[in-house]
Amino acid sequence: MILTSVLGSGPRSWSSLWPLLGSSLSLRARSTSATDTHHVELARERSKTVTSFYNQSAIDVAAEKPSVRLTPTMMLYSGRSQDGSHLLKSGRYLQQELPVRIAHRIKGFRSLPFIIGCNPTILHVHELYIRAFQKLTDFPPIKDQADEAQYCQLVRQLLDDHKDVVTLLAEGLRESRKHIQDEKLVRYFLDKTLTSRLGIRMLATHHLALHEDKPDFVGIICTRLSPKKIIEKWVDFARRLCEHKYGNAPRVRINGHVAARFPFIPMPLDYILPELLKNAMRATMESHLDTPYNVPDVVITIANNDIDLIIRISDRGGGIAHKDLDRVMDYHFTTAEASTQDPRINPLFGHLDMHSGGQSGPMHGFGFGLPTSRAYAEYLGGSLQLQSLQGIGTDVYLRLRHIDGREESFRI
């Protein structure tokens, strides 16, 4: 490939290399199929946006600012005001904070090896962030409730524009997998991009939800969350998927602190739980293909204390092979990794791309489910760990720190 031979696959100076993109892609287009030519044209068009804003001083200045992360307690006790001043305060915080966080992600896209950044799908996501930065910084300062209402419309639009970013990143990296030489660099990029996206969506959705008067909720924070109820919701969802795929699904038993209730943010659980449950059910069904209507139960244990919430999901799906155990929490997008048959690494019916509001989007099979869940848990001050009993099954431990516990909570 022309770009590979000229530019290589290592990091380069994007500001000096972007002018080469048009001519390089033109040469490449001569030897590609009609589909590839279409992709080249898309890349050329999208590069115009990236090129025109690449040296924009506003992005550079914002990227040097630190983000101001809030604790859920700050969000919970910021209070409601009769005159709506809490909405103005929240909106002004977002107006200051979102451009900074988005500028950080644009800087992250610049750090990618040039040949990966030229991928049309990756370029499209890069462009989405630049356009979002432009729209947010073009919005005038929020002075009154009318301004805040218009700002909410912009935030809703941007949330919708970015709803497929996880899927697009997975597609782009799989398309670019032969150019990935430093997987640690790409994994760091993904961890930062995906967790930043989660934080942005949580803050934005929280602000929008402050306009609603929903029982037991302050914004996106549920003041009396029941782990058992949210688990049951996603058990029903995962069982329907499993029944559609295999004709049956394991039963699920929930034990432990089933009566626990406490303030918490459901959104991370809405992202993580479907993935873990789907994996457990799939592993169970795949390891009992000879007896699909007589499979072991999946057992979920809830442990609640004054520091954190622990959810253990135990399946009898045969466990994870020793050779795969060290890699199961990694993002899988290379050719060699795509050939594995382990359910958690190369799923037959994909991984969930969860959108804002806790609704499940389309399924995608790029091996992003577990590593994304792990990154989310760590971002929220917790962890996601697996214990495999090869030949028996797997226990998955999800720990999430309380927002009102004895120790300091996480920051969003």
UniProtKB/Swiss-Prot annotation:
Enzyme class: transferase
SUPFAM superfamilies xref list: alpha-ketoacid dehydrogenase kinase, N-terminal domain (SSF69012), ATPase domain of HSP90 chaperone/DNA topoisomerase II/histidine kinase (SSF55874)
Chain positions with Phosphoserine modification: 31, 52, 356, 360
Keywords, ordered alphabetically: Acetylation, ATP-binding, Kinase, Magnesium, Metal-binding, Mitochondrion, Nucleotide-binding, Phosphoprotein, Potassium, Transferase, Transit peptide
Up-regulation conditions: Expression in female liver is influenced by circadian rhythm.
Reactions mediated catalytically: L-seryl-[3-methyl-2-oxobutanoate dehydrogenase] + ATP = O-phospho-L-seryl-[3-methyl-2-oxobutanoate dehydrogenase] + ADP + H(+); L-seryl-[protein] + ATP = O-phospho-L-seryl-[protein] + ADP + H(+)
Residue range covered by the transit peptide: 1-30
Residue span, Histidine kinase domain: 159-404
Principal localisation: mitochondrion
Entry similarity comment: Belongs to the PDK/BCKDK protein kinase family.
Protein name: Branched-chain alpha-ketoacid dehydrogenase kinase
Lineage: Eukaryota, Metazoa, Chordata, Craniata, Vertebrata
Gene for this chain: Bckdk
